[in-house]
A protein has these predicted regions:
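N-terminal Lys/Arg-rich, disordered targeting/topogenic segments
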Residues: 1-10
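Transmembrane signal-anchor/signal-peptide helices with a preference for the extracytoplasmic
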Residues: 25-45
Length: 168
């Protein structure tokens, strides 16, 4: 009888190990999934904050242009405002490089960054137009503004698709 008990104990040991490994794998899977959700949520907050900063800075610049159009701001003042604006936009552009997007969102980050690059270039041309009065500078600025808008729309669509789990 004692030998039978020994065999039973030995046969239970591999089953216990296999059960522990399976439980460990399940715990790891759910932990990894939770961590991915947390990273995704943190990334979503970071990109939203960055987009809001860009939108606010853009709004201030547009407001200054409106004042300049009404002759409430001189050309020199507008150029100074524009140069500070470009500095701010370039700092915001660098923030895109600091983001660590989940793989599904990398395309949207590239497009949103491209949009801001177009905006910066557009505003450089606009400032050059203010300085020189050369209408071709204004036309180029407007073209780049359109490209910026298109890149931003594509970036937002890509972001929403990634959020919904749609392959890109």
């Amino acid at each position: 009888m004692k030998k039978r008990k020994a065999k039973k104990t030995k046969s239970k040991f591999p089953i216990i190990i296999i059960g522990a490994v399976i439980i460990g794998i399940i715990v790891f899977y759910f932990y990894s999934a939770d961590q991915a959700k947390i990273r995704g949520f943190a990334f979503g907050n970071e990109i939203q904050t960055l987009q809001e900063e860009i939108r606010n800075e853009q709004g201030q610049f547009i407001s200054s242009i409106a004042k300049w159009n009404e002759n409430a701001i001189s050309n020199e003042e507008m150029i100074g405002i524009g140069e500070k604006h470009l500095e701010t936009f370039n700092k915001l552009l660098n923030k895109y490089d600091e983001l660590q997007p989940p793989d599904a969102f990398s395309r949207s980050v590239k497009l949103l960054k491209l949009s801001l690059e177009y905006q910066i270039e557009s505003h450089e041309y606009r400032l050059e137009w203010i300085k020189t009065g050369d209408v071709t500078e204004l036309i180029r600025s407007q073209e780049l503004t359109q490209l910026s808008f298109e890149a931003e729309q594509a970036g937002l669509k890509s972001f929403n698709d990634a959020k919904a789990g749609i392959e890109q």
